[in-house]
């Protein structure tokens, strides 16, 4: 991971100032009365805006043990959690606090699939399809289902889908929303190799269009060239809640994955 600078407590690849597409400075978050992390900086810059291999990445994977703040960070960026301190910028302006405005920028896929059992696969996508003109919604839904290999199951009720099919249905929402920022929590949970390959195609196309990705995971993801942001509570965390956060390059971080 290139373009790093080091702070007193943490280090992560950044750009000076809010110059990236998605940039955070000095983030700290509490869960109840416990400090989850602090002094967290990062930048995500689309590949279309930087020379190849230079500067901040367009994708970052979040790794670390359970409870280290991976999901909390994603939920913060999605607007569901407020930071105790710190700022997040979107194209040199503070990320909008209004949910409707933020939803035009980020799509968040949590670790739960949010599939309604009484609705068909296609009907489960109606809300996300509302971002499209009314006359194009059916086509948009069918295209999204095709992208994740669920075209043949469009009329099947959610309760009849397997765990992997429900996960693919959740990921198809990315194709409907078409936002520049994807926030993904354990996106490949329950997916087989063929489904992961389809998801990899989605990620490549998104990044090629200038999109950026932040994903929490315990397993390798199809995100070649992504940076790694490690959240590791240590002895100090037991006293202050501080997390050790480190930019770790493009290689797997050894035993940290598991």
UniProtKB/Swiss-Prot annotation:
**Reaction catalyzed:** heme b(in) + ATP + H2O = heme b(out) + ADP + phosphate + H(+)
Q: Which SMART domains match?
A: AAA
- What positions belong to coiled-coil segments? none
Family matches, as PROSITE patterns: ABC_TRANSPORTER_1, ABC_TRANSPORTER_2, CCMA
Its Enzyme Commission number(s) read 7.6.2.5
Domain annotation ABC transporter: ranges: 30-257
Q: Which domain of life is it from?
A: Bacteria
Keyword list (alphabetical) reads: ATP-binding, Cell inner membrane, Cell membrane, Cytochrome c-type biogenesis, Membrane, Nucleotide-binding, Translocase, Transport
Its biological purpose: Part of the ABC transporter complex CcmAB involved in the biogenesis of c-type cytochromes; once thought to export heme, this seems not to be the case, but its exact role is uncertain. Responsible for energy coupling to the transport system.
What's this protein's family per the entry? Belongs to the ABC transporter superfamily. CcmA exporter (TC 3.A.1.107) family.
This chain belongs to the protein called Cytochrome c biogenesis ATP-binding export protein CcmA
């Amino acid at each position: 991971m290139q373009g790093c600078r080091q702070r007193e407590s943490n280090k992560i690849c950044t750009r000076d100032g809010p110059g990236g597409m998605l940039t955070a400075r000095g983030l700290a978050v509490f869960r109840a009365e416990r400090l989850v992390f602090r002094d967290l900086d990062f930048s995500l810059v689309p590949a279309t805006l930087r020379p190849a291999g230079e500067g901040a990445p367009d994708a970052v994977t979040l790794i670390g043990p359970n409870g280290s703040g991976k999901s909390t960070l994603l939920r913060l960026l999605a607007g569901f959690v407020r930071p105790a301190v710190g700022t997040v910028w979107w194209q040199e302006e503070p990320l909008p606090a209004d949910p409707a405005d933020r939803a035009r920028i980020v799509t968040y896929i949590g670790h739960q699939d949010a599939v309604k059992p009484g609705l068909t696969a296609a009907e489960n996508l109606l809300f996300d399809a509302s971002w499209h003109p009314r006359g194009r919604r059916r086509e948009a839904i069918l295209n999204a289902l095709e992208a994740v290999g669920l075209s043949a199951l469009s009329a099947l009720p959610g309760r009849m889908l397997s765990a992997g099919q429900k996960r693919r249905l959740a990921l198809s929402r990315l194709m409907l929303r078409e936002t520049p920022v994807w926030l993904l929590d354990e996106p490949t949970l329950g997916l087989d190799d063929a489904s992961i390959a389809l998801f990899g195609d989605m990620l490549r196309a998104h990044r090629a269009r200038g999109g950026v990705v932040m994903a929490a995971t315990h397993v390798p993801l199809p995100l070649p060239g992504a940076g790694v942001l490690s959240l590791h509570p240590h002895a100090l965390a037991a006293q202050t809640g501080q997390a050790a956060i480190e930019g770790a390059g493009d290689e797997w971080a050894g035993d940290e994955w598991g």
